[in-house]
Amino acid sequence: MIAWLDPQDPFPPVEHALGPDSEAPGLLAASRELSPQRLLLAYRQGIFPWYSSGQPVLWWSTDPRMVLAPPALRVSVNLRKTLRRVLRDADWEIRVDHDFLAVMRACASTPREGQDGTWITDAIIAAYGALHRNGLAHSVESWYRGERVGGLYGVALGRMFFGESMFAHRTDASKIALAALCAFLGNHGVAMIDCQQETDHLASLGARPIPRAEFVAHVRAATAQPAISPWRFDKSVLERWAGTPAAPAA
């Protein structure tokens, strides 16, 4: 049995989440409300929302938790070649927070293997949009010849980044954005990106599962640190992975 949360109710301890032998491992609570304030409380405790349209808001704290250390991003030979091409080619850009809501909508409309529909509902878009307006959620976008072709978004609290979703309309476009994000976060002392749930795709990028207790302890410490400011970078951060200087701007 999981807790039902009224607006004033705190989250139960994450240890109360359903266990690995249940039908929904990691499910902790449900609510009708999805406010920016509730989201911030959740993230600082290692909890995230994930639900489908027509369901109540479902809150999760999975054990183990999938995380990516920015320096551990796995850059394949082919991706490294792509990053070098991006650095040389003026048609490629990395833009930060250019159109956060458009990135969310692109993530929502991208088909996912094994998923019908999307969990990025209108309520999710509204709540994360409010966080973005307050400087707490960010998008990293890959642009090619003036068109957004890939990107990702997530929540940034202190020195912790909580990844939410990504999309690509061109080969490796989301990985380009992720490589830029990892380089930027690594430069600012961020040790861990939350990837939430274990998938083969995340593992192929260098993410690994860690015990929930270890994750929650790290989140508490990292979110108490000063926030990164400003969130401003371009594709030159990709030099970390490509080993090639970016071409000078025309």
Curated annotation (Swiss-Prot):
Its EC number is 2.3.2.6. Keywords: Acyltransferase, Cytoplasm, Transferase. Functions in the N-end rule pathway of protein degradation where it conjugates Leu, Phe and, less efficiently, Met from aminoacyl-tRNAs to the N-termini of proteins containing an N-terminal arginine or lysine. Pfam families: Leu_Phe_trans. The gene is aat. Belongs to the L/F-transferase family. The keyword Transferase applies. It comes from Cupriavidus taiwanensis (strain DSM 17343 / BCRC 17206 / CCUG 44338 / CIP 107171 / LMG 19424 / R1) (Ralstonia taiwanensis (strain LMG 19424)). This is Leucyl/phenylalanyl-tRNA--protein transferase. GO terms for molecular function: leucyl-tRNA--protein transferase activity. GO terms for cellular component: cytoplasm. InterPro entries: Acyl_CoA_acyltransferase, Leu/Phe-tRNA_Trfase, Leu/Phe-tRNA_Trfase_C, Leu/Phe-tRNA_Trfase_N. One of its GO terms (biological process) is protein catabolic process. It is an enzyme of class 2 (transferase).
